[in-house]
């Protein structure tokens, strides 16, 4: 079951669920909340090494942190690792049912050729950080992305009550910065 706007608004207004953004400033849709683009993003460096080996590479050798002043023009086929401004804590079960967050790109941007992907698609139970967003321009044209523009939407869906709930142990406190991939032999 996916929660609707009225239920979400009630949960956040009552502080049963929490957000780092004032509830009056959240962008509620019929069954989701729009999230906005943080000014911080990573791009790939020009480097002599052309292969990233997930078992051996140090990702900091390949990526550089940037900041959007007002906007960036995403070139055709260009990829950036961005982040959302908003974070949500929905770890308190409602009526004995636990919920997780699910992220999708906005259809308007998709129709322009922008793919927004959260590497996991779902936030694990207890996830309460900002989503890291893989943003790719599939269009033959440059597309302008503005700081704080609505970039994706988050849905809240229930978990099967037969599972043992384990709290999220992921990437840590990103707080508006994209989480870089963790590489190394122990990860693959």
Identify the role of each PLM range.
Residues 1-188:
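DUTPase catalytic domain/fold
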């Amino acid at each position: 079951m996916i929660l609707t706007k009225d239920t979400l608004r009630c949960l956040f207004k009552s502080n049963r669920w929490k957000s780092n953004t004032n509830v009056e400033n959240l962008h509620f849709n019929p069954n989701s909340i729009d999230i906005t683009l943080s000014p911080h993003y990573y791009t790939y460096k020009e480097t002599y090494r052309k292969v990233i080996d997930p078992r051996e590479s140090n990702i900091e050798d390949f990526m550089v942190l940037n900041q959007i002043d007002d906007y960036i023009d995403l070139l055709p086929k260009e990829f950036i690792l961005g982040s959302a401004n908003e974070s949500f804590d929905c770890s308190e079960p409602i009526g004995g049912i636990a919920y997780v967050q699910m992220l999708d790109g906005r259809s308007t941007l998709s129709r322009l050729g922008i793919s927004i992907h959260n590497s996991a698609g779902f936030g694990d139970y207890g996830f309460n950080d900002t989503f890291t967003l893989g943003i790719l321009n599939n269009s033959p044209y440059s597309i302008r992305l503005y700081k704080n523009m609505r970039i994706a939407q988050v849905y809240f869906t229930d978990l099967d009550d037969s599972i043992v709930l384990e709290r999220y142990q992921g990437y840590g406190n990103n707080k508006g910065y994209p989480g870089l991939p963790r590489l190394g032999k122990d990860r693959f």
